[in-house]
Amino acid sequence: MYSSSNSFLGGANSTRPGQQPYMQQQPPFSQFGQQQPQNQQTGLAPQPTGYNPQFSALGASQLQPQATGFPPGQIQPQYTGFPGVSPQPQQTQPTGFPASPQQTQYGGFPSLGQAPQIQVTSNTNIPLRTGQQTSSEIANSFQNASVATPTPPPKASGGKIPNIRLSFITAQDQAKFEQLFKSAVGDSQAMTGDKAKELLLRSKLPGSDLSRIWVLSDTTKSGQLLFPEFALAMYLCNLRITGRDIPSVLPETIKNEVSSMVDIISFQVPDTQPEPVAKTNVPSFDAPLLENKLAPPAPQQPRPQQPSNSQLLSQLTAQPTGFPPSSGYQANVAVQGQNQGLVPQATVFPGQASSQNLQPPQMGILNNPQPTGYTGPRPPMPPMPTGFGSNLSPSQTGGLVAQPTGIPGQWGFVNAPASGLPNIEALKQQLMPQPGREGGFSAAGLSGNASIPWAITKEEKKIYDDLFRAWDGLHKGFIGGDTAIEIMGQSGLARNDLEAIWTLADPHNRGRLNMDEFAVAMHLIYRKLNGYPVPNRLPPELIPPSTRNLNDSIGTIKSMLSQDAEHRKATGAFLQPQKTGVSYLKEHSFRGGAVSPGAGRKDATLFKNNDEAAAGYRSSARRRVGNSGRTPSPAASQASEEELSVEQLKKKIRETQIMLDAVDFEDENRAEEEDALDRRDRREAESLMDRIRRVQDDIDTHPHAALRSLDTGAERRTLRRQLQAYEDQVPQIASEVRRVEREIAEAKLELFRLKDAKAHPNSALNIVGTGPGGAVTEADRIKARARARMQARAAELAGRPAPASQDDEEAATRRLEGENARVKAEREKNDSMTRDVEESVKEFARSLEDSLKEGEESSTREHERRRWEDALGVEDVIRDFIYDLNRGSRTAHIRKEEDSRGSSLEPRSRESSAHTSTAARPSPPASVGLTGASPVTHEDRVAAARERAQRRIAERMAAAGLKPQTDAIETLAQRQERERREREERVKRAEEEDAKREQERQRRIAEEQRTPSTQAAKPAGKKPPPAPPRGSRKGRTDSTGQADAKKAAEGSAKTEQLALEQALKEEQQAQEEETKRLETEAKQREDEFAREQQEQEARLRALEEQVRQGKIKKQEEKRRREEAKKAAQEQEARLARQRAELEAAKERERQLQLELEGLDESSSDEEGPVDIATPQDSTPTQSQVLPATSDPEPPAPPTPVAEPPTVPEPEQTTASSSPESSRAVSLRLSPETESKNPYFRRNVSQPTDYPPPTPPEVPQVSSTQMPDTQSTNPFHRLAQQQQPPPPPPTQPAFTGSAPLARKTRARPEADDDWSAAESDFESSDDEDDRAGGGSAKQLASILFGTMAPPRPLSAMDTQSPSSKSATPVQGSSIPPVPPIPAEIEPSSVADGASPPPPPPPPPPPPPAAAPPPLPSAESPAGIPPPPPPPMAPPAPPPPPGPPAAAPAGAPDRSALLASIQAGKGLRKVQTNDRSTSTSAGRVL
């Protein structure tokens, strides 16, 4: 009666899937499985209810297929409750358990204790690569020649490369790479390490570069290369061949493209499954599980400890059946983890605990189907036992949850463990916003044992939604990156995992998560905490419904449009859409139904103008009476009109005319009244506007108008901050007051003690206390009493009267206590006063704060302010009026500022003129004495300068939009008024002083002008008479004394007049200079103020921009760009400086050649030209030590060897690497500006400086990438083999090894585009060419040949312009000459010179150095003068200049010059000073 049920997965008679089909024969069962079922019998064939055994994979060909139970892919056939043919029901049946004294086992559990079980792990979606080398071994094979050939991997079927374009290579290159890849791998999907090595070695690149390329290319670390990885390796080889550097880390875009294509290829590789079996009539349950082929597999859980048989007997539940064969599932988790599509199997009727009550099956020759087992009426499906024994009770199927009823990928329909999701409530409590959430988080308690599917259950979704709502307090509908960092950071996961989870949860790169995306992120975190890896791609089950529905809607719309266009094109409806008569409205539905709610409605495609339906004019249609529709039918009105006579109609017309006239009259009266009201309102509005204008003018012209602040909100906030600052100071001041009061009280007590001790010398109060706080202890009293007794005894012995009777201790204590009480009372009174002041200050501050809060702008007030001040939402007239008022206010404000600036500048100019006139006065003591009583003192000038400084500061603050600090004692208006009065007084005094000074100066000038004229007139009339006596005094015998005296007097008068004129000129010049100086200072001050103001404005703008954007990253980028630009500018300046030095060196060279010509003329025969040959190879290169093969030098005394300058080489390295570092910086910054992942931003916000890779550092890079572990790079050992020996330790002088190494690598060979260093590989490749791999190698050689740059160029020449100078071309140009330090002897100078000088000229001194002094006569012969001191550190060498040919016919001069450079002394320097080279050194 249940045979027609199709409710479970479409199988006939499948309502009870564990039971055999009704009225059909059960296949025979044998103990050892030797009898095969008779699949073809006459009549009805036996229908097995299980699956045919898949013997080919597990080697169980001798076993019989079981009727029900688990598939035999992993367990042995088992019997399900019937003894079958076997007459021994007590024998052990092969049901999966080992042989034991137990009864016949009918359950469906496998033998978990058997040894020969084959466990196939879950598929990793990557081609199985068994029996081959690892990536590390392949990497080592590139460094080691002797490596065993690995066994080839099993070839996967179908080597199809996905049709996906890689953006980092061109389409032509990708096609070439695909051809090369296919020719190399054949039908396989992956290229082995050896094959990749053979192909990549044809690039002729060094092993270090190939090692780094392999590290970057082998993204899966599997020792093989899929096509995208191979294309990436070829791309990196192309980069290195063309001279560019290999990046240390792949860019994000390239890495994402390669990993995505690798995943696609991996998903296309089929799982390793057993061979298919013969087709049977068993229903197939594979289809629902194979619908979603691209979904990642269900996560495989770590295998728990296998239970024993007794534990299995106590834990047995209903047995599921119908499980599809799969190679990736384990039998011990089938009940909880693999129960999709399974129902409990009833193997024995309840109550029939043993098999004796069951009917044995009738098997064999009968044609009719025989019932087996229980033959009674078929009951409903109750919970059934599994037939183990009578002690077992019927087990419920509570371990299984609801079956999936939705489509795959639908949220909320998924099987979860019956015991609930492990520790997800703990995760929810951990991630809820709560105090102390900044602490650490431990994932130790979140490790569950349940196998969680990819999809999110309803319970999980509810928990995640609660978390989202708890964190989304403002109900924005999303959670930003910062909040997500705080939430997800509490999970304790690594930042890389959180970054990957964010990338999966935020597919649109919005930088925030909505509710569904947040649920995805939380689910991935939960799975990661339970030990499952984060997937590379978001599984289809985890795609949020919002995103999926949106994509489906877009696809539906596109399909609708395309189908509509195709339909109209096919039917010809697009030609005349108005005549088709087909409504497309009902077809445009997202629900897919043929009839939509709007189907009865007509759209524009069905519109047709119906002229016949147009009705005539109906007067009743003019007006509607309320909401009751039209007036009564016009038929009645027509009948009534026909009954009226003409007179009646005329009467009605007259009455209607009268009524219309009355209505018109009323309308005219109403219009007149409205006009009158409008005129009155207009007049009132104009009067109000006039009043408003006057009030605004009064406000603008008021002296305190500058104090008016339109930004009341900002001012209110400023006042509130000031009030808060003052409130914060109140407790501190109160504590200071209390401390002072306490000190005053202590001082009063101490003073009272001193006074009391003076008044009562013998009092006990005179005791000095040594206790804490000066308290008098008992020991102090004992000492005082002993001292008093000693004093009395001393007085008695001395015969003095005994001291007065001591005051008792009680009296002293009473006096002290009284004073203490008085001081304490006064202190308490003051303390209470302080508390009162504090409370009053708090109340006052509270009232002020309340008043400030009351004045805050509400929404209504803000609306009103924007309406009446910003003219938003008002009429045009009012808006124009408001704009006019604003313009008038701004004009008045600007005019007032100009007036105030002019008035402030005028006194300043007067003061400056006053100072100018004061400074311009002559400085004789008499003039100072005349103006000694000046009212402008030094204090006044200091005050004026301070005022000017304060005014400038205030102006700058006002220009910057800041408010000056107001004085707490007086208001701003009072202070301005006081300063204005003081300024006016100072201006008045300055004007008076200027007037007095000017009068004094005019008077003095007039007197000085009169004095020379009188003095010039006096010698003519008065001086000659006294002259003879003076002459007679000097020489009385001289007859011409009078004439001489007269001439002397005239000469003295002229001299005095000239002296006066000179003094006047000097005074005028001094005045002019002083005036210019003051003007210059004033101009400098103004320029400084303008510059400071500009800088302040620039800083303010920068701060505002930073606050508005909040992106510190842009500043960092700007700083880097500026540094790069600055470095480039410095490099240009350095090059220009070097060119200038080169020109100076050439000029100096010419001078030295002239000196050498003179030297040759003056030299003797014995010191003739020394034949010294300077071969090319011995010419010192850049920072290179001269080789030992040079000509011997003359013996010289031993001198200390000084280190040559080692500056040019590091600078050159920096200069050459600066473009590469800037390029690397730009490369690292490009993806950062695109991604909004907050973890990625946090990683990138911490700058990482990557050193630019240089050729000597390549082995170090490769070694640091693979520490302590076996390298997976196939090029590692090749790099070690090809690596040159390490350079020797750095000597005091630079050697030329590094530049020469660069030169050999940079130069292209004559006949080939590749370096000849790897020529042996080509010969070995030719020997190893085979039929299978020859074409691939030839293609690789062709490809790498096309990658090479043009032949005249080289890889190192294209890196940077400054690197060209690092490779010297010998004999082609004049290299620069560095400056010579003072402490270096000539030989060391020659050794340490950075660039090689050409044979003719010697190294000249630096151009900025002064020439050394010539040797004096006292200097010993043969000692050259010392070289000039170095003026600047040596610069890096500039690019080589044009070739300069040596002077023809001057080989002797060259040889002599070389000897001079080597330190040879000249003998005849005392005869010819020009013979000594200024660049030669002196032995110290």
Swiss-Prot record:
Residue ranges annotated for the EF-hand domain, each copy included: 205-240, 493-528
Coiled coil feature spans: 635-760, 807-843, 965-1011, 1052-1165
SMART domains, per database record: EH, WH2
Positions of region (Disordered): 1-100, 289-331, 351-384, 615-643, 793-866, 893-1484
Compositional bias of kind Low complexity: 17-47, 306-316, 1209-1222, 1382-1393
Composition-biased stretches (Basic and acidic residues): 811-866, 894-913, 937-955, 975-1010, 1063-1152
Compartments, record wording: Cell membrane; Endosome membrane; Cytoplasm, Cytoskeleton, Actin patch
UniProt main location, coarse: membrane
Membrane topology qualifier: Peripheral membrane protein
Subunit note: Component of the PAN1 actin cytoskeleton-regulatory complex.
Protein family: Belongs to the PAN1 family.
Protein name per its UniProtKB record: Actin cytoskeleton-regulatory complex protein pan1
Gene, per the UniProt record: pan1
